[in-house]
Amino acid sequence: MKKRVSKEQIPECFWANRPKFLQWLGKTILTIFDWHVCGSISEKYKNKRLVAIVAPHTSNWDGILGVAAVAGLDARITFIGKHTVFRYGLGAFLRYMGGIPVDRSKPGGIIEHAIDQIRDIEGAIIALSPEGTRSKVLEWKTGFLRIASELNA
């Protein structure tokens, strides 16, 4: 039977070395929802910054399944989320998983804030939703391009 997700899909430099229970939980959630993580990242990208475009972002389930995939892969993946989700215990967990809260009511600083948070992370995978929202959009926002350019990702 084909594995749904495996940490062997990414170079070791991107491994987070989180607890085995968390890896198991991520894999179990993906199994329940019949999701797979397809493909792998080549060793030639190790110790580099990569930007992964995650689209379309249309549901709150995207975040749950995304965090499950991050846990199942045991990956050090940085992602941006709406600041209101980062409250109480959930906020601490999301930060532990690589989340960066952003306040979208202050749009001028979102990209700069994200870049400042990510700049010092070597060998980072940055997962971004180019829509910037769950709402249907006709065009993607360009922040992910600015982040990739600034970080040489």
Model-derived regions: residue spans:
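Soluble catalytic domains of membrane acyltransferases
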Residues: 15, 32-153
